[in-house]
Amino acid sequence: MRTLLASPRGALVKDDRLLPFLLRGKTLVTVGDVTTKRCLELGLVPRTAIFDGKTRRSQWVELRAPNGVLKAFNPPGQICLDAAKVVKKAILTSTWVKVEGEEDLLAIPALLSSENGWALLYGQPKAGVVLVEINKYTKLHFLEIIKMFDGDVEEFLREFDYDPNQPLLGELDERLYDLLFPEL
């Protein structure tokens, strides 16, 4: 699982100065302190940012949210359902989320809560920033990843309006999905 999630799940942008051009007209969601701070420096204000006030587990800077901050607890290496619900609320209300614990995997509920056509950015250590264009297929891709997690996956799927008893893809979609994401 860690190996699967360690590789970029979108387009790796090595030169972040390109972000204003790549994100023109997009609603932006960011995950991570460094990614959020760099976006702000470039004049890109995320609708929602998910951060923990640290970088690489050491104390860092406090980010100033334009529309308020919700708080969530999320243990390292997990997606706590309560934290996922806070992220969903933040996406709906254009607020930011400060996480006690680890924010990395909260990119998944952020993506699932976002509208198609938006963009999600998260850092890829020592490589750049990963840009995920949010659409039906990226959502299905991350839902497939969620199915591999331990815990109450069905409750998580229901929270994000997916019926765990229904197939996620139709036959035509499945073939296209396999072309887009062959590693799963």
UniProtKB/Swiss-Prot annotation:
In which pathway is this protein known to take part?
A: Cofactor biosynthesis; coenzyme A biosynthesis
Q: What's in the keyword line of the UniProt record?
A: Coenzyme A biosynthesis, GTP-binding, Kinase, Nucleotide-binding, Transferase
Pfam families per the UniProt record, alphabetical: DUF359
Reaction(s) catalysed by this chain, per the record, are: 3'-dephospho-CoA + GTP = GDP + CoA + H(+)
> Which residues are noted in the entry as GTP-binding?
33-34, 52, 54, 103
A Gene Ontology biological process in which this protein takes part is: coenzyme A biosynthetic process
Protein task:
Catalyzes the GTP-dependent phosphorylation of the 3'-hydroxyl group of dephosphocoenzyme A to form coenzyme A (CoA).
Known EC number = 2.7.1.237
User: Which molecular-function annotations from GO does this UniProt entry contain?
Assistant: GTP binding; kinase activity
Name of the protein in its database record: GTP-dependent dephospho-CoA kinase
Query: Which cysteines form disulfides?
Result: none
Task: Tell me its family.
Answer: Belongs to the GTP-dependent DPCK family.
Q: What class of enzyme is it?
A: transferase
